[in-house]
């Protein structure tokens, strides 16, 4: 006997469906429940905290089983998707009444973290991306798709660091990678990783899939034809989404090449340290996005976060945004636009569900409501003079044909689903209205029949009723059942009553039930036809949604600029960061004390600032606010300052704070040095670099050596605009030795054992450290502080004595060349590989070295 024949027919059907979906959970519909079996049941019981039971036996073994009610399935799906799991939904598609054996079932949809479109399963104000990654010869192809909007992009990071930064920027909910993918550490700690066959990433297969999706002969029109690695990833991605959605994807109409040269590059450490959309604790409070985002719509919020994570280098684009914000701010139009745009809502995701034909009746009701707001929006925008705002207003112009169609087709307050009807409005279809009238007319007929039968037979307890089991019936109390005429056929006996059926009632029942089912069938057909009528407008609707989202972002930034007293930055191509009275956009909102604004000046003659001052004095805040102001200027936003001139920046680097990376086995110092190495390798003269307390994780001399050498390299070899905060006061001598460097410090004032931080940036180096005073503020016992002061006095005395010529100790302040340049002989020797030399070549090399001495 074959193994499959050892199972019941129902389990054979389940196992066949499970074999088609081996790597995901299978929700198998049985009556009012979705059941899971075997390993799926064990896994689901743990993830969902539901009971694990058994269902009889199959092949001689008890079958593990778990289940969830069908009416509550969305909540369970949401939890599984949040955990990175995918689920195949298997429904009964056959008629139990006509089925021989198990009812026919099939998988009707696959819910995955990266492809969900249902509102209940999505974070409203965050993009929901699925991505694919491909690797070849140290370079990467990376494609992302937002199924809820149709936004499809690819990029080709040139290194692991750049790839890690892209993964952090996009935070995909689901990540596809080939079976032979080597740098798997990039995916460590991520949910939703999906291993795919290598052939799905083949270039020709990818091009075929993409051309088929876009209806094109080639990809030249998208400007991606030479992005070979990116196309390999994009091809796998589109095939996977087609397989899971099991329908066409008409809203995915283009593939864009995201060139890294077009945007300010932010590595993973910078995004983390600047707390752009996620704070260091993993939440969203006290982030730049939390301060800037007061958008009226979720799609506006999502667009703003994309702007924050991908600042633009193009000055023209940023000036257009700033011009638009200026007009909205000066005329206070943001207060008029906000309420109208809020009524339009999140039509971007509604359109995705429309394209996938998974939209529900209330989605189309909301789309209708959005269309009804467009005339008012057009009126509000009619007085605008800015060309960019005018172009957005044109794209968001009223669509009367779509609005009129939805007003005719959909009831004012439709039900949640089409299943039970009641969605299509009266007057939309004469055929539907006719069948509905027949079904609705049943009530009047029944009332008339009840009255006639009661009077004819003198039975005052006679009632006409209906239930789902027995259909229509005539009910008579037990006490009057003897009055029932002979043609009444008993249908059911109750404790205190009898129920009967008569030919007239049976005939009416057949007619009513037929009219209801006929009306429902017509309504479902009209519903599907409505999709066909709306889909030709999809491209135009998507353009409208994008325009409204951008209007929302711009009015939001205008409101923020007005409310928070931001200024318009002056944009220039020169390498300069000149800020007057700059403020940290987040800290000034959360602190109860008045925020101390500070200036900064970086230019071609002043490329690096050595920043000293006490811990808690504000060095890190000062550095971060500079980076955030520069970043805000590169998204086309006003900035928190009295005035600001911001040059074109290609990258922002931050080396601020560090902690052990236990998962990768890296110490704090190793993390710090890795980030430092990344900066020293990749920074350019147009980069903004923030370096905070380099070298503190090792011994004093090692730390000072590394800090000095890093600062020296940045100043002499790279020339990046750099803020270099340090607790090594020896580094304040660097501006005396190298050009284009300057010292600044944050001051503090001591009063006995207490200390007051001034938080004001002053020119010059700090006069002293305040470590013991800060330790006292932290609650270190006074006895310990006293002992520390005594030890400090001894060390300072030894240092003073050691500075005399007779001393053998090292005077660090005067020994700045801690890492001397290698001699000519050492350089020549280092370039020689003895394994590659013949005896003659070795002898010649020896003579050359001898001459150099």
UniProtKB/Swiss-Prot annotation:
InterPro entries: DNA_mismatch_repair_MutS, DNA_mismatch_repair_MutS-lik_N, DNA_mismatch_repair_MutS/MSH, DNA_mismatch_repair_MutS_C, DNA_mismatch_repair_MutS_clamp, DNA_mismatch_repair_MutS_core, DNA_mismatch_repair_MutS_N, DNA_mismatch_repair_MutS_sf. GO terms for cellular component: cytosol. GO terms for biological process: mismatch repair. It holds the Pfam family MutS_III. Gene3D superfamilies: 1.10.1420.10, 6.10.140.430, DNA repair protein MutS, domain I (3.40.1170.10), MutS, connector domain (3.30.420.110), P-loop containing nucleotide triphosphate hydrolases (3.40.50.300). Keywords: ATP-binding, DNA damage, DNA repair, DNA-binding, Nucleotide-binding. SUPFAM superfamilies: DNA repair protein MutS, domain I, DNA repair protein MutS, domain II, DNA repair protein MutS, domain III, P-loop containing nucleoside triphosphate hydrolases. GO terms for molecular function: ATP binding; ATP-dependent DNA damage sensor activity; damaged DNA binding; mismatched DNA binding. It comes from the Bacteria. PROSITE patterns: DNA_MISMATCH_REPAIR_2. CDD domains: ABC_MutS1 (cd03284). ATP binds at residues 613-620. This protein is involved in the repair of mismatches in DNA. It is possible that it carries out the mismatch recognition step. This protein has a weak ATPase activity. Belongs to the DNA mismatch repair MutS family. This is DNA mismatch repair protein MutS. It comes from Vibrio vulnificus (strain CMCP6).
């Amino acid at each position: 006997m074959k193994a499959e024949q050892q199972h019941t027919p129902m389990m054979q059907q389940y196992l066949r469906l499970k074999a088609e979906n081996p790597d995901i959970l299978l929700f198998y519909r049985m009556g009012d429940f979705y059941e899971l079996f075997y390993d799926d049941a064990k896994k689901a019981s743990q993830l969902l905290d539901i009971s694990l039971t058994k269902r009889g036996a199959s092949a001689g073994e008890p079958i593990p089983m778990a289940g969830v009610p069908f009416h509550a399935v969305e909540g369970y799906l949401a939890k599984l998707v949040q955990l990175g799991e995918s689920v195949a939904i298997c429904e009964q598609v056959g008629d139990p009444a006509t089925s021989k054996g198990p009812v026919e079932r099939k998988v009707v949809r696959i819910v995955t973290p990266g492809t969900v479109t249902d509102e209940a399963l999505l974070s409203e104000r965050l993009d929901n991306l699925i991505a694919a990654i491909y690797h070849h010869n140290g370079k990467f192809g990376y494609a992302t798709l937002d199924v809820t909007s149709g936004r499809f992009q690819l990029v080709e990071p040139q290194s692991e660091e750049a790839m890690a930064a892209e993964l952090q920027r996009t935070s995909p909910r689901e990540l596809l990678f080939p079976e032979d993918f080597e740098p798997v550490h990039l995916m460590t700690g991520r949910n939703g990783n999906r291993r795919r066959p290598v052939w799905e990433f083949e270039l020709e297969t990818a091009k075929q899939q993409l051309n088929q999706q876009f209806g094109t002969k080639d990809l030249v029109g998208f400007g991606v034809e030479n992005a070979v690695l990116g196309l390999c990833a994009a091809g796998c991605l589109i095939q996977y989404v087609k397989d899971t959605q099991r329908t066409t994807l008409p809203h995915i109409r283009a593939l864009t090449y995201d060139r890294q040269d077009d945007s300010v590059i932010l590595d993973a450490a910078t995004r983390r340290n600047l707390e752009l959309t996620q704070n260091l604790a993993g939440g969203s409070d006290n982030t730049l996005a939390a301060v800037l985002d007061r958008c009226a719509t979720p799609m506006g919020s999502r667009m703003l976060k994309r702007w924050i994570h991908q600042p633009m280098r193009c000055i023209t684009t940023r000036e257009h945004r700033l011009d638009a914000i200026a007009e909205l701010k000066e005329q206070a139009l943001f207060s008029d636009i906000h309420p109208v745009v809020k009524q339009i809502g999140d039509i971007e995701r509604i359109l995705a569900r429309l394209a996938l034909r998974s939209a529900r009746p209330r989605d189309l009701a909301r789309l209708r409501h959005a269309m009804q707001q467009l005339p008012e929006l057009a009126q509000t925008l009619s007085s605008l003079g800015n060309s960019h705002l005018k172009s957005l207003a044109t794209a968001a112009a009223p669509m009367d044909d779509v609005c009129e169609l939805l007003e005719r087709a959909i009831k004012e307050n439709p039900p949640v689903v089409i299943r039970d009807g009641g969605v299509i409005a009266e007057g939309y279809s004469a055929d539907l209205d006719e069948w509905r009238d027949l079904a609705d007319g049943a009530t009047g007929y029944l009332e008339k029949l009840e009255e006639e039968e009661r009077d004819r037979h003198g039975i005052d307890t006679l009632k006409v009723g209906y239930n789902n089991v027995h259909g229509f019936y005539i009910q008579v109390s037990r006490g009057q059942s003897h009055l029932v005429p002979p043609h009444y056929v008993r249908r059911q006996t109750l404790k205190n009553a009898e129920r009967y059926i008569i030919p007239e009632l049976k005939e009416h029942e057949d007619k009513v039930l037929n009219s209801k089912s006929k009306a429902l069938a017509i309504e479902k057909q009209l519903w599907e036809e409505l999709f066909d009528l709306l889909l030709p407008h999809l491209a135009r609707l998507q353009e409208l949604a994008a325009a409204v989202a951008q209007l929302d972002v711009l009015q939001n930034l205008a409101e923020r600029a007005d409310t928070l007293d931001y200024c318009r930055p002056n944009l220039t191509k020169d390498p300069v960061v000149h800020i007057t009275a700059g403020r940290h956009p987040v800290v000034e909102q959360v602190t109860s004390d008045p925020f101390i604004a500070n200036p900064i000046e970086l230019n071609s003659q002043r490329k690096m600032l050595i920043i000293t001052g006490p811990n808690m004095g504000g060095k890190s805040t000062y550095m971060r606010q500079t980076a955030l102001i520069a970043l805000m200027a590169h998204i086309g936003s006003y900035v928190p300052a009295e005035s600001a001139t911001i040059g074109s920046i290609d990258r922002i680097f931050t080396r601020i704070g560090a902690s052990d990376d236990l998962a990768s086995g890296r110490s704090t110092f190793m993390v710090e040095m890795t980030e430092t190495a990344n900066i020293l390798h990749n920074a350019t003269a147009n980069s903004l670099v923030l370096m905070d307390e380099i070298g503190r994780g090792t011994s004093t001399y090692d730390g000072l050596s590394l800090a000095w050498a890093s600062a020296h390299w940045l100043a002499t070899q790279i020339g990046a605009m750099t803020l270099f905060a340090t607790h090594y006061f020896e580094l304040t001598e660097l501006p005396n030795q190298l050009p284009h460097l300057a010292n600044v410090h944050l001051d503090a004032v001591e009063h006995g054992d207490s200390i007051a931080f001034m938080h004001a940036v002053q020119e010059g180096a700090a006069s002293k450290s305040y470590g013991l005073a800060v330790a006292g503020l932290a609650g270190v016992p006074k006895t310990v502080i006293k002992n520390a002061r005594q030890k400090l006095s001894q060390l300072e005395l030894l240092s003073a004595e050691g500075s005399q010529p007779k001393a053998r100790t090292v005077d660090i302040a005067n020994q700045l060349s801690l890492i001397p340049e290698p001699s000519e002989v050492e350089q020549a020797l280092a370039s020689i590989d003895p394994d590659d030399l013949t005896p003659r070549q070795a002898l010649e090399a020896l003579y050359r070295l001898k001459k150099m001495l």
